[in-house]
Amino acid sequence: MSKKAPAQKEKKLPRAATWYELDLEKGVFRFKNKLCPKCGSVMAFHKEPVPRWHCGKCGYTQFQR
């Protein structure tokens, strides 16, 4: 019996429009997410179990009030 090769998935790259906000009046791009104060990487927002911002690179966490 012949084995089938696994189907290759297309990689979907994130669009820059999802990362930035554009202010047309001022002509300025602004980053939507927070940057880590320790290492400068982009922080991710998590809703469960407690709302918080977390840096995956250095482990820094800011809890929401």
Curated annotation (Swiss-Prot):
Species name: Pyrobaculum aerophilum (strain ATCC 51768 / DSM 7523 / JCM 9630 / CIP 104966 / NBRC 100827 / IM2)
Cofactor: Zn(2+)
Identification of the protein by name: Small ribosomal subunit protein eS31
Zinc finger (C4-type): 36-58
One Pfam family per UniProt: Ribosomal_S27
Keywords, sorted A to Z: Metal-binding, Ribonucleoprotein, Ribosomal protein, Zinc, Zinc-finger
Top-rank taxon: Archaea
Cited NCBIfam families: PRK00432.1
Subunit structure, interactors included: Part of the 30S ribosomal subunit.
Gene designation: rps27ae
Entry's family note: Belongs to the eukaryotic ribosomal protein eS31 family.
GO biological process: translation
